[in-house]
Amino acid sequence: MKTLGEFIVEKQHEFSHATGELTALLSAIKLGAKIIHRDINKAGLVDILGASGAENVQGEVQQKLDLFANEKLKAALKARDIVAGIASEEEDEIVVFEGCEHAKYVVLMDPLDGSSNIDVNVSVGTIFSIYRRVTPVGTPVTEEDFLQPGNKQVAAGYVVYGSSTMLVYTTGCGVHAFTYDPSLGVFCLCQERMRFPEKGKTYSINEGNYIKFPNGVKKYIKFCQEEDKSTNRPYTSRYIGSLVADFHRNLLKGGIYLYPSTASHPDGKLRLLYECNPMAFLAEQAGGKASDGKERILDIIPETLHQRRSFFVGNDHMVEDVERFIREFPDA
């Protein structure tokens, strides 16, 4: 049985130029995930369920666990002295770590994706993304360090808190998964070099918003529901409402996750930096594809910290089908 720490160090030795800083950074994220796991499991016994009464920069009501997870991850990253700053879905602006100007990395994160599901005991997750800073080492980081396209990511991953807690990550050399053993306090390797199955058979979308979707997406949903044995249709509809949980299931079983634009969110709802980019990096490393319906997610140059985007991610052939329908059936 190989632990996450052992696996990361083993992979580090494959790179002659490795300094160990990225290894230490991933270790900090691992620690934060353990703390969040512990408190999610007793969320109903302590006062961290429900809304906090505050709103984030997007005007969304923050859950108490959102804020808790944000603070724990931020503290774990700052304590290691290897991160120059962070950007978080729960922070209005970037957070510059004083005294860490020498650090080479910045971290972007969604501390608790799907947190509204906590009250009903549904799986939630943590998403993280790591970049090398572009401003000179030795100076405080600026927004420029965070507004990089996804193809510049050094590492990305997520933690899914479900029937078991699992950490999945990539450094650009495949996707690897580790299950948390609470009796030992360690993440243990359970799947190495994960890949999407050759053919997907599940589509994940909130069909309650069907009337608000673009024409191309409506046509694709009907395509998924039609019977065609040659393409293994109709597909199965599965939607949890937590990006991490839906993506993880589709990675294992094969499928596509869709979050298109609507009239109320014409640019889409998911955040490019905190959700789309890291999941797109993971998807491509697992043989899948991620798109906003027109272009590759990882090639989009971000303009603002909390920029939103339409998001389609999963098996490559399924994402390509969505893109085709969007091209062929544009909105009037």
Curated annotation (Swiss-Prot):
Which Gene Ontology terms of cellular component type are present?
A: cytoplasm; cytosol; protein-containing complex
Q: Which PROSITE patterns match?
A: FBPASE
Amino-acid positions noted as binding phosphoenolpyruvate in the UniProt annotation, renumbered to this chain? 3-5, 30
Q: What is its EC number?
A: 3.1.3.11
Give, as one word, the top-level EC class: hydrolase
Signal peptide limits: none
Report residues binding Mg(2+) 2: 110, 113, 275
Where along this sequence does the record place binding of citrate? 3-5, 30, 187
Describe how the cofactor binds: Binds 2 magnesium ions per subunit.
**What does its activity-regulation comment describe?**
Subject to complex allosteric regulation. The enzyme can assume an active R-state, or an inactive T-state. Intermediate conformations may exist. Activated by three-carbon carboxylic acids, phosphorylated three-carbon carboxylic acids and sulfate. Strongly activated by phosphoenolpyruvate and citrate. Inhibited by AMP, which affects the turnover of bound substrate and not the affinity for substrate. Allosterically inhibited by glucose 6-phosphate. AMP and glucose 6-phosphate act synergistically as allosteric inhibitors. Phosphoenolpyruvate antagonizes inhibition by AMP and glucose 6-phosphate.
Q: Where does beta-D-glucose 6-phosphate bind?
A: 222, 225
Which GO terms of the molecular function aspect are on file? fructose 1,6-bisphosphate 1-phosphatase activity; identical protein binding; magnesium ion binding; nucleotide binding
The record's subunit annotation is: Homotetramer. Phosphoenolpyruvate stabilizes the homotetramer.
Please give the PANTHER family that the UniProt record associates with this protein.
Answer: FRUCTOSE-1,6-BISPHOSPHATASE-RELATED, SEDOHEPTULOSE-1,7-BISPHOSPHATASE, CHLOROPLASTIC
Return the protein name. Answer: Fructose-1,6-bisphosphatase class 1
State the organism's lineage. Answer: Bacteria, Pseudomonadati, Pseudomonadota, Gammaproteobacteria, Enterobacterales
This chain is encoded by the gene named fbp
